[in-house]
Structures are given as structure tokens and as C-alpha cells.
Amino acid sequence: MDGQATEHADVVVVGAGPTGLLLAGDLIEAGVRVVLLERRAGQSNLARAFAVHARTMEQLQIRGVADELAATGTTIDALVLYGRAAIDLSRLPSRYPSLLITPQSRTEEVLTRRLRRLGGSIVEGSEVVGVAQDEDGVEVRVRASDGAARRYRASYVVGADGVHSAVRTALGLPYPGRSVVRSLMLADVRLTDPPADVLAVNGVGDAFAFVAPFGDGWYRVFAWNRRHQVDDTAPVELSEVREATRRALGTDFGMHDPRFLSRFHSDERQVPSYRVGRVFLAGDAAHCHSPAGGQGMNTGIQDAANLGWKLAAAVAGWGGEALLDSYQAERHPVGKQVLRSSGLLVRLALIRPRWGRAARNFVVTALLGIPPISTKAAGVISAVGLRYPAPPGADPQVGTRVPDVALRDGRTLADALRGGRFVLLGPPTGDLPEPVDAAEPREGGERDRLTLVRPDGYVGWAGAAHRFPGWSQEYFGRGTGRRPGAASGTVGPSRAGSG
């Protein structure tokens, strides 16, 4: 590498899957110089992820691409578990009270188009072979597909490069966990006698399967047969998928004409820390789990939405260590919870004794028939119910998700948040720091009370209007990203403020 020219950037993002694409786009929109590296040379045809949950759609709405993605798939309003038990998504307090079924490749295409509209690009065929950091920045060494060596220098690096993350490996981070299910089969097929338009999941001890419609005549099938365990590299025959599906769901729905067949194994793993100095991990590079519930890609996108504005603040010079550390504090517990919930779905599906399966079906159906429990389950799996921890003494609103609302100026809150802005909801107030825009809800709200919404759509501060000027001057003006008081909450600006 001696004599090799070094390209400089504010942030290097490694991995151009959904997590890296959304993050890179957010950073570029905030005025950050970004290099996005991708080992692949072209689009992947492997798309295990297919479910886009409500909270992810809300994040995409903030970025102006939700409708574009929605047009590529179909929506379902219930997640069917173990026969009759179902999680009702239709009552979610969201503009998107459903689950969008579309291949991950479509999500990547939509986010790639957004990236390019913002002036970004992907450096394809770039394999990371080394990462080294010091007090001032991070150096990333890359081997291009033609064998050429390249070097990048940035203030921060984000590894969003999947389960086999080169960034995580270069850091020497452990990825503790275990394999949960081996020899899982994945198929995209047509069905002669398709099921109802819901995501169906069931297990009978020796077999597990679920089926989801793409909406264009194709169906995604995951299937597993305990009696037929082979290496991941073994080719998949459609007959194997049919047999496992029949065992789990009672029928193979007349599946035929496969356009894609694959075999893989499912792990449950999570790194101890999402941050090591100036290097961060997001998406599957930080956590992986079973596909049950369809939360993997969604969790990665939420990682990116959380991290992007914080890195932009740091690059601008005022987002300090406490703000960057809040990424670990807020997102690591979410990853752990997703591991638990998706793992529970699989373990319940794989109960072997007949009496155990009968008990499972009875208990799960009964529990989901209780409205508060059903509402909680829908909020957890969709991430609409997610709340970030707030500091002691903070206003009860701090850390909560803010639903999209209509504003008096004709926009919605999602419109106002676009571009990584903070939005101060409430009655008109005085001068604001540069990162903050004022907006008044068309309906509701309290006189003399303000709510500061972070760029990712969560409450960062709330309280009496007369308290905001002093708080914001200290917070946005100091350039520290530290909370000045107990009422502040987990918030940080995206550009230096004037106070």
C-alpha cells in the first residue's frame, strides 16, 4: 500500500444493503462527505428479507420514498401464527397499519435511487481488507475487484456489511451466539391453490414453514424439515420444499415454477458493543437472528435512522461523545429484544410433542385474544411501540415515537423532518437554533408546551415553552452533544446552532 493515494471523506460506510444505503443517503442529505463501499459488483439476486414493517415505512416516508416502495409489493394486515392465532396489524396507530411484502432487492433499488438523486454513488467491487483507527480518524484499506489497492481516510466508519462483516472482523470483535436452525430452505414459487392473503406460519415439531405473497403471482416460502438436514451448499430441490411445507402447513398449495431456490442456516448473534472508538456497526454486522417475524432488515434500517443524524452532528463539530454513545444505549437493547422475540417464534414452532403443540396453539390463541396483549404484540413486531430510554426526571414523552401529524402550514410532520431536521412542535416561539424548524400541529397540542422531535421521529425534549430557549442554547450552542439537564432527553442537533 506504500505510495497509494488516500481518498478522504467524513464517513465511510461499508455495505450497500438497505442499512448502508439508508445511512449513506441520510448523511449526504445532511451535507456529510460519504464514501459507500460494496463488495458485490452489481445487484444481488439473493433476497431473504421480504417484510417491511410499519415503523420502517414511517422512516421511509420521512425520506420521501415510502409510496415508491409500497408500489412494488402487497400488504397484509395480520400475522398468522400456529394455525388460528394471529397478530392484528390493522389497528396500529400508523399511516401504515400493515406489513408490506416485497423482495429486499426492491428496497435496495428504491434506496439506491434515492442515494443517486442526492448525488451519492456506490463504489462496487470493493473488499475491505483492513481497518485501523487513531485519535483523529480511521483508515480503511480496500482491494478492488481488479486487484487494485485503495485506501480511504475518514473521521468515522460504519460497518453495515452483513453477518460476515469485514469491518467487525478487522476490529477483532466477537460475535457471540449460536446456530438455531440449520438447512433452512428458501423458495420463490407460484401456487396453484394459494392460501388467504396473510403471512402464514406454522410448525409441527419435525417441520416448520411460512408462506407470504409478493402480490404479483409469486410467493416466498421458508421451509425446514428436521428429518432432512444437509449442508448449506447442497442444491435445493422443489420436492424438498413441497414436503416440508406439507408437513408444516398441511398442503404445499400446488407450488411450481420456482424462480429461486436456496439453503441457509439461521443464527442468533449480537456483538457486545455497536461502537468501538470511531467505528460503528449496524444491521446484520451487529446482530442476526431467525427470519421469523421478518424483523431483520427492519432492525437494520432503524439502526441507520438512529445513527445517521448523530454522526452528522459529530461531523458538524458539536455532536459529542455522549451523543455517539447513545447509539449503543438505544439500539443494543432493541437488537437483544429482537433476538429474543424471533427466537421465541421459532422455538414455539419447533415444539415436537403433539400435546405440546396443542398447548402452544391454545395458549397463544388465548393470549392474542386479549386486546392489550394483542396491541402490545403488534407494537413490538412492527416497532411502532418502541420507546427509547429517557434520563431520570425527563418528561414522560421523551424517547417516545411521534406519529405523523398534519401541520397548519399544509405539510405533515414527516415532510418537516425530511433532510435530517429537528422539528419543534407547539405554539409559535422565538428564535431557534439552526438545526430546528418550528411547526404547529393542525389539531391538538397544549398552550405553552413544546415538543422537540428528533430527525428519526422520536421525542428528544418536551416541556414548558419558557424552558426551551435556555436548554437549546446550552445544548445546541456548546457543541458537546451532552444533555444539560434532566428534562433534556436523548437528543442532539445536526448542524452547529447559533443559540
Q: What residue spans do the PLM features occupy?
A:
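C-terminal helical "tail/cap" subdomain of flavin- and related membrane-associated enzymes
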Residues: 313-403, 408-422, 427-435, 447-456, ...
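Core Rossmann-like FAD-binding/catalytic domain of the broad FAD-dependent monooxygenase superfamily
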Residues: 1-358, 364, 368, 488-499
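A signal for specific C-terminal beta-sheet/loop modules enriched in small/flexible residues
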Residues: 86, 233-244, 439, 464-481
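Thiol-based oxidoreductase modules, predominantly thioredoxin-like and allied folds used
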Residues: 437-443
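Short, well-ordered loop/turn elements at secondary-structure boundaries
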Residues: 205, 275-277, 284, 418-420, ...
